[in-house]
Structures are given as structure tokens and as C-alpha cells.
Amino acid sequence: VVFDRQGNLYVSGGRSGRIYRVGPGGGSAQVVAQIEAHTRTLPDGKTQQAIVANGLAFDAKGVLYVADTARGAVWKMPVGADGKAGKPTLLAQDRLMDGADGLAFDGKGRLWVTSNERNALVTVAPDGKVEEVAKNGSEGPLEFPAAIVFVGNTGYISNFDNPRRDNMDADGKGALDGIGASIAQINL
């Protein structure tokens, strides 16, 4: 969810690819944009990723950005003063953004994307160039990073990793993988 300058609330619709808007006074949600549906098979060969409209963020000019988890992409679209969105255009699509989830702009106007499938953070330049900034183990504990928000020069990243027993031996003994829900930080 994200608010625009006029107080409209925007909500992503996940698999539907829809972006909804609720006006400042509340009421029913209106569909204002649509990202085309897409499904991708994950590396395990079994799991299907079909979430196309996920994290949302506005830049300083009022352009709406949408994380496309299934494609590993970010879309952008103009939003008019009436809260209606224009046609989505692809800003970037890159394997570095596999599992694109949360979006946020820092104080310098850089777009940050959490890549949950890669346990990474990337930035996307206005020309669509994608750069990896942190990966699990390099800047802190990133375990299925989901959302990101900046407060001053500090980015806070929510991790949704669930502890699981993936390394069990035949007797059912093994290490508990995953750190569970947590918050990571990155300082600019």
C-alpha cells in the first residue's frame, strides 16, 4: 500500500495484476491500472510464482512504481491529479530482481527493490539499470526480504523467512534453517 500526495490509497492486487485506489474519504476500491498476468516456475521446478502486482512506491514527481514478483521486474505509470493511472511501462526486468517484492525511494531519489528469491537488495536507475547493493551475508541478514522503508539515511527491511527443517536426515534430525521474521538495516 502507498498514499499519493492527494491522500489516495493505492493497493496492489497480487496475482490479479490490478492496482486499486481508495479516495481520501474512503469508500470502495476502484481499479486504476492492470499489469498483465504472468506465471514463472521457480528453480525447484514445482513452485509457480504468479504475483505480478506487489510493492508500490511513488517518486517525487508522482509517478507510481509497481514491483512485479513473477517477472523480476518494475513497472512505472503516471498518475493524474484525479488519481487515475496511465498505461504501465516496463522500467526494468532483470534476474537480479527475481522475487521483486518491496519498493522504496531513498532521500536521494534512488529506487530500492527487495529481491526475496535472492535474499538481496537492488537499486534501479531511471534508465532501468539494475545494480545489486546487498545480498545475504554482505550487508546484513537478508532472509526473504519483503518490504523496505527509509527513515533518514537508514533503510529498514522486513524479512519473512520462516524457520523450516530442510536439512533433515533419515531419522528426522537436522538443522533448523531460516531466521524467522526479522528486521534488517542498511545505512546510506
Give the residues covered by each predicted segment:
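Short loop/turn segments immediately following the C-termini of beta-strands
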Residues: 14-15, 69, 79, 116-117, ...
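Surface loops at the rim/top face of extracytoplasmic beta-rich domains
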Residues: 4-35, 64-71
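Beta-rich, blade/repeat-based domains predominating
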Residues: 1-9, 16, 38-64, 94-111, ...
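Short, conserved, GDST-rich strand-edge loop motifs in beta-rich repeat architectures
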Residues: 160-178
